[in-house]
């Protein structure tokens, strides 16, 4: 399971 905010912090 992969977390979007954990792997891709582009906000």
UniProtKB/Swiss-Prot annotation:
In this UniProt entry, the residues modified to Sulfotyrosine are 4
Coarse class of the primary localization is secreted
| Lineage: superkingdom | Eukaryota
GO CC, alphabetical: extracellular region
Give all Phenylalanine amide modified positions: 11
Subcellular location per the Swiss-Prot or TrEMBL entry: Secreted
* Pyrrolidone carboxylic acid modified-residue sites: 1
What biological process terms from GO does the record include? defense response; regulation of blood pressure
The organs and tissues expressing this protein are described as: Expressed by the skin dorsal glands.
Q: Which UniProt keywords apply?
A: Amidation, Amphibian defense peptide, Hypotensive agent, Pyrrolidone carboxylic acid, Secreted, Sulfation
- What modifications does the entry list under PTM / processing? Isoform 4.1Y4 differs from isoform 4.1 in not being sulfated.
Q: Does the keyword Secreted apply?
A: yes
Q: Which family does it belong to?
A: Belongs to the gastrin/cholecystokinin family.
Role played = Hypotensive neuropeptide.
**Protein name as annotated:** Caerulein-4.1/4.1Y4
Q: Which organism is it from?
A: Ranoidea citropa
């Amino acid at each position: 399971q992969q977390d979007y905010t954990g792997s891709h912090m582009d906000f």
